[in-house]
Amino acid sequence: MAGAMRKMAVYLGLVEDDGYDGRGFDPDDDFEPELDPEPERDHRRHEPAHQSHGAHQSQRDEEVRVVQPPAQREPMPRAASLAAESSRPARIAPVASITQERASLEKSAPVIMPKVVSEREPYRITTLHPRTYNEARTIGEHFREGTPVIMNLTEMDDTDAKRLVDFAAGLVFGLHGSIERVTQKVFLLSPANVDVTAEDKARIAEGGFFNQS
């Protein structure tokens, strides 16, 4: 710095210095003053900026970093999955109370009573030979009393015989009995509480009209 000021003073003629008159010195030469070195505080002032820039750069690098997704597991083949399932212990279903279910079934099941076959009650068959339709009342009275009636219509004309058959059909229907044709004009009327045996029916068909006591 002092050398530069002296050069400037010599150049202006304020100071004489023979050393500058020698060869190689020209007062007309341009020169620049020497600059003092940059103070250290300037470096310290710029250091935080560099450090901040480095921090931002590292943060930017971390943001740009690509995160690879985890590798997906390949699906297990069906045969392998079935083998794995078969190797697992089977779940045991809870055992319900059989006694309780049986008791409930016994309560809900219908009770079937054994059929009791009673002994055949004795019956008496009455044979009637009506000649007119007016005798239908007599047939109805015997049948209502629970007596089987053999109705022989051979002595009646066809018109009255047909009317009497219609009456007998309505009679047995109303009292829940039955009517059977033995021959063309002979009919057996059986009440609901009487079961005429097959043997007696055969005898009636053979012409054995009788009053059985």
Swiss-Prot record:
Cell division protein that is part of the divisome complex and is recruited early to the Z-ring. Probably stimulates Z-ring formation, perhaps through the cross-linking of FtsZ protofilaments. Its function overlaps with FtsA. Residues 16-89 are annotated as: Disordered. This is Cell division protein SepF 2. One of its GO terms (cellular component) is cytoplasm. HAMAP family: SepF. It is found in: Cytoplasm. It comes from the Bacteria. InterPro entries: Cell_div_SepF, Cell_div_SepF/SepF-rel, SepF-like_sf. The keyword Cell cycle applies. Its main location: cytoplasm. Residues 27-39 have a biased composition (Acidic residues). One of its GO terms (biological process) is division septum assembly. Homodimer. Interacts with FtsZ. Belongs to the SepF family. Keywords: Cell cycle, Cell division, Cytoplasm, Septation.
